[in-house]
């Protein structure tokens, strides 16, 4: 009798990874379930009424799924790599005026990078997750392809995977929509069939990142609000509490809504009206290539770019500067944010060419200043 192929399934305690494990069992794999313990949780973060992920409650749910499926289940301690790769960068990015994307870092270095290292120690080549994505091979290179359910599509968070990791990853849910996954969970009798989806950053209770940063000892840098023209219009208590494109919570009275245009090292937060948020270009750094082979210095190419998870890709032209790209938009795009990820796709394709980080200080805007100063409204 042929021995079943072993596969490790990363089980978060949610319905998606539970169904992924069940489907692989039905497909004939020898499934081993693992949960990655990434964070030492304080009591408030363990409130089971909150829709977070990776909490002690989620570990219990993942273990219950393992019992229900009758598969081996293990908890792997990942606090060290998670702290170094995800939390440390999260803190340093905010301190430096960038807006981080911890889920990208976690996928790249923990859920796939570190987990593959553990799998290889056990002599296991393949892992699977409950991500909504697919794998495609293009001209001898591997890439993440959009899921069928575009409302759940997660390719944006997976651009950092290496060629070897993509090749050896299975995404059982890539061809399904969420409602179908729920029905399969009910058919399988899984205890998490009706569990709500996670909606928070796992280590940020209540999504209050400012309180988290303060607990980590970060000192906020107070400074001035000013317009792109240079006119000072107010004060704030810390640049670390703002992000590019932010409109709410500024505390500035103005005839039209103001948005954060940039955050300067000296603590200055530059504001402008909505039309001033439109960007012309930016520089991409920390590039990971997937279907696209590395571009030669000076080589240009038109493609599509996505600058945030919920936004639609837009047309752009990229030019290789060596280790970075110059990205010029061919359509209007608002509030390009340094520190966030940008993913790239063929103009007529549904798979990843490449991805990287939007470089701080590299963003050019179409309109430099369009706000008339209202001296009577300046709360200094």
UniProtKB/Swiss-Prot annotation:
It comes from Leptospira biflexa serovar Patoc (strain Patoc 1 / ATCC 23582 / Paris). InterPro entries: MnmA-like, MnmA-like_C, MnmA-like_central, MnmA-like_central_sf, Rossmann-like_a/b/a_fold. The gene is mnmA. Residues 152-154, 308-309 are annotated as: Interaction with tRNA. This is tRNA-specific 2-thiouridylase MnmA. The record marks 131, 340 as: Interaction with tRNA. The keyword Repeat does not apply. Keywords: ATP-binding, Cytoplasm, Disulfide bond, Nucleotide-binding, RNA-binding, Transferase, tRNA processing, tRNA-binding. ATP binds at residues 10-17, 36, 130. Disulfide bonds join 106-202. Pfam families: tRNA_Me_trans, tRNA_Me_trans_C, tRNA_Me_trans_M.
């Amino acid at each position: 009798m042929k021995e079943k192929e072993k596969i490790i399934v990363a089980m978060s305690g949610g319905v998606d990874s539970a169904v992924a494990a069940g489907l692989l069992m039905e497909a004939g794999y020898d499934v081993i379930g693992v949960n990655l313990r990434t964070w030492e949780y304080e009591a408030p973060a363990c409130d089971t009424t909150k829709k977070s992920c990776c909490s002690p409650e989620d570990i219990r749910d993942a273990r219950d799924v393992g019992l229900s499926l009758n598969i081996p289940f293990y908890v792997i301690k990942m606090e060290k790599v998670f702290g170094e790769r995800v939390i440390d960068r999260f803190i340093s990015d905010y301190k430096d005026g960038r807006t981080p994307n911890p889920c990208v870092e976690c996928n790249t270095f923990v859920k796939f990078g570190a987990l593959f290292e553990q799998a290889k120690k056990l002599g296991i080549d393949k892992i699977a997750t409950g991500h909504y994505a697919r794998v495609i091979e293009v001209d001898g290179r591997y890439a993440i392809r959009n899921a069928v359910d575009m409302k759940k599509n997660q390719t944006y968070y997976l651009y950092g995977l290496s060629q070897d990791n993509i090749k050896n990853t299975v995404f059982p849910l890539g061809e399904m929509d969420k409602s179908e996954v729920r029905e399969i969970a009910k058919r399988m009798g899984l205890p998490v069939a009706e569990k709500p989806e996670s909606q928070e950053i796992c280590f940020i209770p209540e999504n209050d990142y400012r309180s988290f940063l303060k607990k980590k000892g970060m000192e906020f840098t107070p400074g001035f609000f000013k317009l792109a023209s240079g006119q000072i219009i107010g004060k704030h208590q810390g640049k670390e509490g703002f992000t590019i494109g932010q409109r709410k919570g500024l505390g500035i009275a103005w005839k039209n809504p103001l948005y954060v245009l940039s955050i300067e090292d000296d603590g200055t937060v530059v504001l402008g009206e909505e039309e001033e948020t439109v960007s012309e270009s930016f520089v991409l750094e920390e590039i990971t290539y997937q279907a696209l082979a590395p571009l030669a210095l000076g080589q240009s190419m038109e493609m599509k770019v996505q600058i945030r998870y919920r936004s639609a890709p837009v047309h752009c032209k990229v030019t290789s500067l060596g280790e970075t790209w110059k990205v010029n938009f061919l359509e209007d795009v608002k509030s390009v944010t340094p520190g966030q990820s940008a993913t790239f796709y063929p103009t007529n394709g549904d798979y990843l060419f490449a991805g990287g980080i939007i470089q701080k200080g590299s963003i050019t805007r179409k309109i430099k200043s369009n706000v008339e100063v209202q001296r009577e409204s300046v709360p200094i």
